[in-house]
């Protein structure tokens, strides 16, 4: 399969390395020239959960157009860059090309569908999956639990199963689901509660949960998102969202979520797609979400210290 991966930071680099190492033709597209040059000159070094290896058959470019038509596009950018990534794909798409987006938060599929045919969009949810880039040309894979895939408009299909098989053959634990939006929302409420609080208060997930004050705020954040999802018609697999969030966080108490890592590195976060999205969807449902409005404002204030 010919695969174009747009956004080869930490997660995208893991996708590129494993998919290329299993025999697919993979193009890595990114604006980080130093990283691309290192991959081109020395291969992409992988360490950690998926094993030690150097993958040398990845083609790189700063322009998606250089890759030409392909079978699958994987958008692995930050949530804020999804729309721009979709607009860059004109030369990569045929009637059969599938576009898979794996992001935190809500709305990635909708942003892509403003530019591309939504009938060819697949959505993914990565769980227990972490990575970092210690230096250009080197990705460290912290963990790999499960990638869930589904059709944007629901249901099962042969093409969905085929894409899943390609990822499974590359070493990923992948399952397909008829209602991927349920799974996106279930991860979303955990990110809203724990990532939002961790980023706002500069805590690991365990520290958020151990402090009665921050844990109470985290619970309020998650409950707001849960109520909004229920109003929107999401069929959650659980009745107790607080217990679900607690179970999620307890699996990785030392984790620093991506929004906190972004703030520590003085980068823009994905707050608009996480806590900032809750009030937006709440308003559509005739609800409000004051805790998430407040946390989003706190994190945006932190961002303003280094983005203005």
Residue positions per predicted region:
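NAD(P)-dependent Rossmann-like dehydrogenase/reductase catalytic/cofactor-binding core
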Residues: 217-308
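Short alpha-helical
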Residues: 34, 80-81, 106-107, 155, ...
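Rossmann-like NAD(P)(H) cofactor-binding subdomain of soluble oxidoreductases
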Residues: 29, 53-138
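Short, well-ordered alpha-helices that flank and scaffold nucleotide-derived cofactor binding pockets
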Residues: 17, 21, 87-91, 114, ...
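Active-site-adjacent beta-strand anchor residues
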Residues: 5, 29, 75-76, 102, ...
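Internal alpha-helical scaffold of NAD(P)-dependent oxidoreductase catalytic cores
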Residues: 92, 115-120, 135-192, 196-238
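NAD(P)+-binding Rossmann beta1-loop-alpha1 motif at the extreme N-terminus of oxidoreductases
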Residues: 1-52
